[in-house]
């Protein structure tokens, strides 16, 4: 589940006046379950005007004041607990799919990943209470569960269950052995696509949150592939909501973004996965998640990176190659171009008609016009049907339909 090398920023001191004092809950509740980049960075951080600034989470709205009012308490950790679990934050950071620093540790007898995130805007107590409760109550087999949180100063610390495995980007493109992939069969990739579609549909429509809930971090680095079973789980569920990345309709209106006395808010994204409208305005919607999922579909079919740069010997610089542009070229040319584009490490063993349908679906999801992108519920249904077609194909030609693979380095 690790590919990015993370740089830790010193965590705020627990003695800071702005830090919230968080007491452990009175009763215990348990909840279920890198390589060096040689090319220009794909991390994207445009600046957009906003009326917000860097916010601290004051003791007035601290999580400790919320825990007693939550009918099913998430774990509200004391800051001293996470400090002890991470050896006062001196423990080697866990290399994860996030651009924020994280640690693998044990809290209250449970192995987890602790992420340090900075608040992006002020979140009032009732709003944070509603978000935290709904997110921690949510359960789906394809979504990594948020177990609890704590706050200190400008930071929120989010504790997610630890999943044994590797991220999808590493499974598709092993930096130590590019010619090898654990996802060497078509059916294994369709299983991954189905799991992600199921999980994202749940996040958008069934998680108990509002009808416009957005994940905002969908990419191959943010998908964990479990060891042995090769199932996919979506990471960072609820991060955008709890950190204040998602601005509501009122707060995101054009008049607010046009105020001359506005501050500048940094909007972060990953090149190759950002929808055009997000790049233009910094505002994210569910259709931005659909766009990012479409990119992941194209990655699964081709094995290619969402965006890469290769050295152009003729021009003396770097040439940009987008998986979306390549997919559009393949569709435009037609004929045998699809067979040339599909990941050769699957050894030409896949149902061609299903591969064509997956290519079409991926391109629909990355349409430049968000109104033309399908809803995630429709996408989930189509991917599930294509998975069944793939399974029937595999059974007819006698291929195994169950997977048990080690993700250890090769």
Predicted features, each with a name:
Residues 98-120:
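Glycine-rich ATP phosphate-binding loop
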Residues 145-156, 164-165:
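Short beta-strand micro-motifs within the conserved protein kinase catalytic domain, predominantly
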Residues 163-179, 305, 337:
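Structural motif in protein kinase domains
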Residues 199-213:
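Protein kinase catalytic-loop region centered on the HRD/HxD motif
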Residues 289:
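Conserved catalytic-loop aspartate of Hanks-type protein kinases
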Residues 324-371:
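C-terminal lobe substrate-recognition/regulatory segment of protein kinase catalytic domains
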């Amino acid at each position: 589940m690790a590919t990015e090398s993370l740089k830790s920023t010193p965590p705020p001191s627990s003695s800071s006046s702005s830090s919230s004092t968080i007491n452990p809950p009175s009763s215990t509740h348990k909840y279920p379950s890198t390589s060096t980049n040689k090319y220009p960075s794909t991390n994207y951080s445009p600046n957009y005007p906003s009326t917000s600034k860097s916010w601290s989470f004051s003791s007035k709205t601290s999580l400790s004041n919320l825990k007693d009012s939550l009918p099913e308490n998430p774990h509200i950790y004391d800051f001293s607990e996470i400090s002890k679990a991470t050896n006062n934050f001196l423990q080697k950071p866990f290399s994860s799919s996030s651009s924020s620093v994280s640690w693998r540790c044990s809290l209250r007898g449970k192995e987890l990943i602790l992420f340090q995130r900075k608040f992006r805007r002020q979140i009032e107590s009732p709003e944070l209470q509603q978000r935290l409760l709904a997110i921690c109550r949510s359960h789906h087999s394809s979504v990594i569960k948020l177990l609890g949180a704590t706050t200190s100063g400008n930071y929120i610390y989010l504790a997610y269950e630890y999943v044994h495995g590797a991220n999808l980007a590493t499974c598709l493109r092993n930096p130590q052995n590019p010619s090898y992939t654990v996802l060497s069969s078509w059916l294994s990739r369709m299983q991954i696509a189905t799991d992600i579609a199921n999980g994202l549909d749940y996040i958008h429509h069934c998680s108990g949150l509002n009808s416009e809930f957005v994940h905002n971090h969908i990419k191959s680095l943010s998908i964990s592939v479990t060891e042995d079973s090769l199932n996919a789980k979506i990471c960072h569920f609820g991060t955008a909501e709890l950190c204040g990345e998602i601005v509501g309709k009122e707060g995101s209106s054009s008049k607010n973004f046009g105020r001359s006395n506005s501050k500048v808010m940094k909007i972060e994204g990953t090149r190759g996965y950002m929808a055009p409208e997000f790049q233009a305005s910094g505002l994210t919607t569910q259709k931005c998640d659909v766009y990012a999922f479409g990119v992941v579909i194209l990655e699964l079919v081709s094995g290619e990176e969402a965006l890469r740069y290769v050295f152009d010997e003729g021009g003396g610089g770097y040439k940009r190659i987008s998986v979306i542009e390549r997919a559009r070229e393949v569709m435009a040319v037609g004929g045998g171009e699809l067979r040339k584009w599909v990941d050769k490490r699957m050894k030409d063993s896949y149902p061609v008609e299903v591969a064509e349908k997956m290519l079409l679906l991926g391109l629909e999801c990355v349409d430049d016009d968000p109104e033309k992108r399908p809803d995630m519920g429709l996408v989930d249904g189509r991917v599930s049907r294509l998975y069944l077609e793939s399974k029937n194909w595999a059974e007819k030609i006698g291929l195994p339909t169950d997977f048990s693979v080690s993700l250890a380095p090769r």
